[in-house]
Design a protein with these regions (language model features):
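N-terminal leader/capping segments at the start of a protein or of a new domain
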Residues: 1-71
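Double-stranded beta-helix
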Residues: 152-198
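A short secondary-structure junction signal
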Residues: 122-132, 151-152, 171-173
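Short Gly/Pro-enriched loop/turn and capping motifs at secondary-structure junctions
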Residues: 11-13, 118-119, 127, 146-147, ...
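Short, conserved beta-strand element in jelly-roll/cupin
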Residues: 103-124
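A short glycine-rich, His/Asp/Glu-containing loop-to-beta-strand
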Residues: 38, 62-108
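Conserved metal-binding segment of the jelly-roll/cupin
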Residues: 133-153
């Protein structure tokens, strides 16, 4: 299940809000200018599908969002655990690429998670919002929003990414160390799983 946890940015130990209800997540994120939707998944998409197959399977979603939002570049990002030599190094590099707080300057952050999971953290005002995002979640964050993404130590996700910038993913680091002070992927995922088991 998806999960939203909100903390004061000065206290990562005391959540001010926690919900796994998609409607509540959508409402809470909508209140801070973000978008959250649950979308239908394609059951016939192979687990190891390449980017072209992923885009083809979700062509209707891609076309809808491109038409509505004017995106000019769409790609697929992700990683799947393998026993291939060097995979652990790649996993560390992928996690490190996204885990420091950053913005995307003059572009939005729009991601449709089609497989696996990850945690998006939004630092807006005096609050940090962690969204445990799983397959079927569409998350949209306005340009200039400070955020980070934790793939976990064993990244296992596939996401379709949408851009207004034809250069695709370009980050601007804030220089803050805040991401290291908040519960990481493993902690947030464990909380989501504990709630799911209730």
């Amino acid at each position: 299940m998806s999960l939203l946890i909100t903390w004061p940015d000065s206290d990562p130990t005391t959540p001010a809000r926690e919900t796994s209800d998609p409607a509540e997540i959508s409402s809470a994120l909508g209140g801070i200018g973000c978008q959250f939707q649950r979308r239908e998944l394609r059951s016939d998409l192979a687990a190891g599908a390449d980017p072209d197959a992923v885009l083809s399977a979700y062509r209707d979603v891609v076309d809808e969002l491109v038409a509505a939002e004017g995106f000019v570049f769409v790609d697929v990002a992700g990683l799947r655990p393998t026993d291939r030599p060097g995979w652990s190094d790649t996993a560390r590099e992928i996690r490190a690429k996204f885990i420091d707080e950053h913005t995307h300057g003059d572009d939005d952050e729009v991601r449709f998670m089609v497989r696996g999971s990850g945690v998006f953290y939004l630092h807006i005002g005096a609050w940090v919002h962690a969204i445990y995002s799983r397959a079927g979640d569409l998350l949209g964050v306005p340009q200039g929003t400070t955020h980070w993404f934790d793939t976990g130590p064993v990244p296992d996700f596939t996401a379709i990414r949408f851009f207004h910038d034809p250069n695709g993913w370009v980050s601007v680091l804030t220089g803050s160390d805040i991401s290291g002070r908040f519960p990481d992927f493993e902690a947030v995922r464990a909380r989501a799983r504990s709630l799911d088991a209730v």
